[in-house]
């Protein structure tokens, strides 16, 4: 029994401790994959808020990616069947903790940034660490609201994608 941490011979289950960090993300009451449940809510036009502010950072990143990948695949399937996928907006707070800057271009977040609009998926990501966001995502960002960037390096990273030469000094001086 996984919950007891022992097998039918009452010996400890090998590897059980490796599953402990993800125990809080599971429930015996679940009847379907949480990614599909979220997608079904989105199909109904509902707002889904997934608070992943607590827990193991690796698990938060992994779960976010799994859910985003599911949304992307389902929307792409709908589009490929000649139907219109639902309008979906994904909002990522503290994006530098979720979207890695070293992902492959075929990974979930860069693909959503590059192809998501075709499948009616928009993305809003909030971060103060622009340099930690994948460059392909920055290159495919159409609109930016920039405030409270008090680091010259972050402004330089932003300037690689957009002309912030006129605004850089004022962005650094600006305070909340």
Q: What does each of the following model-derived ranges do?
A:
Residues 112-176:
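Conserved ATP-driven motor cores of ASCE-family P-loop NTPases powering translocation/secretion/packaging/pilus
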Residues 1-114:
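P-loop NTPase motor domains
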């Amino acid at each position: 029994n996984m919950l007891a941490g022992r097998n039918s011979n009452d010996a400890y289950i090998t590897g059980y401790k490796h599953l402990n960090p993800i125990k809080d993300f599971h429930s015996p009451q679940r009847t379907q994959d949480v990614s599909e449940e979220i997608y079904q809510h989105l199909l109904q036009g509902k707002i889904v808020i997934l608070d992943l502010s607590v827990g193991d950072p690796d698990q938060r990143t992994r779960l976010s990616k799994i859910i985003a990948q599911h949304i992307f695949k389902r929307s792409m399937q709908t589009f490929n069947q000649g139907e219109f996928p639902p309008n979906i907006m994904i909002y990522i707070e503290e994006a530098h903790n979720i979207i890695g800057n070293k992902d492959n271009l075929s990974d979930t977040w860069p693909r959503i940034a590059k192809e998501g609009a075709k499948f009616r998926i928009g993305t809003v990501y909030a971060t103060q660490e622009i340099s930690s966001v994948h460059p392909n995502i920055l290159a495919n960002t159409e609109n930016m609201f920039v405030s409270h960037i008090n680091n010259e390096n972050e402004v330089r990273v932003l300037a690689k994608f957009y002309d912030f030469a006129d605004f850089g000094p004022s962005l650094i001086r600006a305070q909340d």
